[in-house]
């Protein structure tokens, strides 16, 4: 199973929750997998699929998890989702969708895309305002020059768009529903997994919903305007207008 979606959308919680179900194991964000993704973008799906399967099979063997159904939760898998699902024909993708305004708020707080940020993530991919591999060709300089809020909204838009690429093999979980009505959020996931709905509901019910809607409190009018300008169409399409 691949849990995908934008960073700060609840992918970590969802991956851990589903990985705790009987017969499953949470693989967390597999670092070699995450590090390989930028170089696989644009490769034919069959080529990328072979590389991804090789990485994950090695990790599963080393982690003694070969007898369980793995739950991989790297958000960047969104950009190679078709290849990942080709590598594992029986796998399901779970796309965790959260209000992009709340995601932007959280990304601004973390500072991963901020002009002043230094350092790197767990896959040694650097933080800061530079253009990531998912920025549209020809817009790299623009990305580095816009406001932090615009970059945060840009990231959310690109991730949710990419994660929607294989709808026939993807279950969608809205973070807001997950925290307010775990049973409703769990039902389609349980059905696709062939799992007991009550078990999925129970693990989803452990989510904390205090961060839902925090953009109303934490974003400045200028930041909100930047987010709406960059991602307004995507927000509206997903019901967050």
List each model region and its residues.
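Short catalytic/ligand-binding loop motif for oxyanion handling, primarily in non-cytosolic enzymes
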Residues: 12-15, 78-81, 101-106, 180-182
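Short beta-strand segments
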Residues: 3-5, 70-73, 95-97, 172-174, ...
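Conserved phosphate-donor/acceptor-positioning beta-strand/loop module used by diverse small-molecule
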Residues: 87-107
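Short active-site oxyanion
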Residues: 1, 67-70, 92, 223
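PAPS-dependent sulfotransferases, especially Golgi type II membrane carbohydrate sulfotransferases
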Residues: 1, 116-119, 123-168, 172, ...
């Amino acid at each position: 199973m691949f849990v995908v979606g934008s960073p700060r959308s609840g992918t970590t919680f969802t991956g851990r929750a589903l990985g705790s179900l009987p017969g499953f194991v949470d693989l967390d964000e597999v670092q070699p997998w995450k590090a390989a993704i930028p170089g696989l973008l644009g490769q034919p799906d069959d080529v990328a699929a072979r590389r991804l399967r090789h990485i994950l099979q090695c990790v599963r063997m080393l982690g003694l998890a070969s007898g369980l159904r793995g739950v991989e939760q790297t958000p960047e898998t969104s950009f190679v989702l078709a290849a990942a699902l080709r590598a594992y024909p029986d796998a399901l993708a779970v796309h965790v969708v959260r209000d992009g305004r709340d995601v932007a708020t959280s990304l601004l707080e973390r500072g991963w895309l901020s002009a002043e940020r230094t350092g790197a993530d767990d896959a040694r991919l650097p933080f800061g305002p530079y253009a990531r591999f998912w920025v549209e060709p020809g817009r790299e300089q623009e990305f580095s020059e816009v406001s932090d809020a615009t970059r945060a909204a840009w990231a959310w838009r690109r991730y949710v768009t990419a994660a929607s690429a294989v709808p026939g093999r993807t279950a969608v979980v809205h973070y807001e529903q997950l925290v307010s009505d775990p049973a409703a959020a769990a039902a389609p996931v349980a059905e696709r997994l062939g799992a007991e709905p009550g078990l999925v509901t129970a693990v989803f019910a452990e989510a904390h919903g205090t961060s839902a809607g925090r953009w109303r409190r934490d974003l400045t009018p200028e930041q909100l305007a930047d987010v709406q300008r960059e991602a307004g169409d995507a927000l509206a399409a997903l019901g967050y207008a």
